[in-house]
Amino acid sequence: MKLPILVAVFDEVRAGRVDLAERVTYRRAMRVPGSGVLHDLDEGLAPTVRDLAMLMITISDNTAADLLFERVGRERVEQVMRDVGAPSVRIPFSILELFQELTDSPGAGYDALREKLRASAGSGGRAIVAEQSVRATPRDICRIFERLEARSILDPASCDAVLDILKRTKTDTRIPALLPKGTVVAHKTGTIRTVRCDAGIVYAPNGAYAIAILSKGVGNDLRVDMALAEISLAVYEEWTR
């Protein structure tokens, strides 16, 4: 869900409704458990929208994602996805709400959710019902990346900025893991319980290509990451053959 939020943020910037230099005051009540660092910081911090976008993508900061999701609005994120030709993308929950669904904890706050997530407690609720949860097809995810690389999803400068952020993603155990050293990849990973994914653009010697590898019903360990990395390598070898 963080890739669509990122694109929607820059679309709002293009439209003049959001400023990348705009500061968002962080409060402890805004914390979201899971990946990221904002939830460990003192309140009163005022990162810019660009700072939040960088944190959301590079270290998959959940709190940053929810702050941007609230700033742009869920309806706007989904409308942008329809406008760019990715109608399968649905984001009915913030990440906090998604975790509340997963753990059967409506209204629960940071501390309670963190403990339940650590224990993998809860039935999953609507979060595991495909028609009601966060979802997207690999085809539409690839379409987003293809249009970013073609500089057609936003204005060229915004596409450049989005791709620059995506190239800074820190998790490199999936699509980039087995590729030749120095291969540039602009990508975003996704992980929640038994779902592990990665999608992006690989800049191969003979041209760039979009790739989306999505898995579900899998274990939460690096063996799954290695399987995704092997798929990525197979695609790379076929592409560059």
What is each model feature region?
Residues 35, 47, 59-60, 120, ...:
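Generic signal for short, ordered secondary-structure residues
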